[in-house]
């Protein structure tokens, strides 16, 4: 009996931790204080949809870092330092209190839409950041000339920085000058140092810095009839 006490306690402890990890996350998806039905909510592995009142309940996987939504057509989301806030980290206090997501209505439901796509800013230092700033200022002037029928998001197709994780925050702040949502995709140079991204086993630590700044590495959103 004495010999089994330690292992049994250890097993019970593991069971308790496992049970805590499986605690469901609950909340609502709201627009103007009203629940939005049918919105997909996920942790990247498991999915659910909001009910007729905009409420959801999701049991997250043990390795989940975010809970996030697939922004439905006809809506956009608030922006923080250029990053669309369709996600929240699961290690925040808000998880225990419930995670609510805010949607903003598009004027024309996004049926007529444009977007700007760019790739490989690959910022390494402050000098290159200033070059990016000049490009973004020109881009802002160009976008301002387009008809303002709906929100015009920007898509950055990877390699935001060039193997310099410390440049993610200043780069994200630079993109904020555009005053519109910037959807980021991860590129090979956005991982940790090159040596840390050569094997699948290093994928999680190599992408963690990106996910801390921009949210999940894969996600979706809807514009008009396009997913």
Residue map of PLM features:
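Short, ordered, surface-exposed loop/turn motifs in non-cytosolic proteins
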Residues: 22-45, 62-63
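Extended active-site neighborhood of metal-dependent phosphoesterases/phosphodiesterases
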Residues: 73-79, 166-227
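Beta-strand-rich domain onsets/edges
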Residues: 13-24
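A short, solvent-exposed loop/turn motif at the edges and junctions
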Residues: 43, 64-89
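Bacterial N-terminal signal peptides
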Residues: 2-14
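Conserved catalytic scaffold of divalent metal-dependent phosphoesterases
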Residues: 31, 86, 99-108, 121-124, ...
């Amino acid at each position: 009996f004495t010999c089994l006490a330690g292992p049994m306690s250890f097993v019970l402890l593991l069971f308790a931790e496992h049970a805590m990890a499986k605690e469901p996350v609950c909340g609502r998806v709201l627009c103007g204080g009203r629940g939005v039905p049918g919105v997909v909510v996920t942790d990247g592995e498991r999915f659910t949809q909001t009910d007729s009142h905009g409420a959801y309940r999701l049991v997250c996987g043990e390795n989940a870092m975010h809970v996030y939504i697939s922004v439905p057509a006809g809506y956009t989301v608030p922006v923080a330092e250029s990053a669309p806030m369709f996600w929240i980290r699961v290690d925040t206090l808000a998880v225990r209190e419930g995670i609510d997501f805010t949607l903003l209505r598009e004027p024309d439901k996004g049926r007529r839409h444009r977007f700007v796509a760019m790739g490989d800013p690959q910022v390494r230092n402050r000098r290159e950041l200033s070059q990016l700033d000049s490009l973004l200022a020109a881009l802002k002037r160009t976008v301002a000339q387009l008809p303002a029928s709906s929100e015009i998001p920007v898509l950055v197709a990877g390699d935001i920085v060039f193997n310099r994780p410390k440049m993610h925050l200043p780069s994200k702040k630079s993109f904020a000058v555009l005053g519109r949502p910037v959807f980021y995709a991860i590129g090979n140079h956005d991982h940790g140092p090159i040596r840390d991204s050569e094997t699948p086993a290093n994928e999680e630590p190599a992408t963690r810095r990106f996910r801390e700044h921009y949210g999940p590495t894969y996600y979706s959103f809807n514009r008009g009839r396009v997913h």
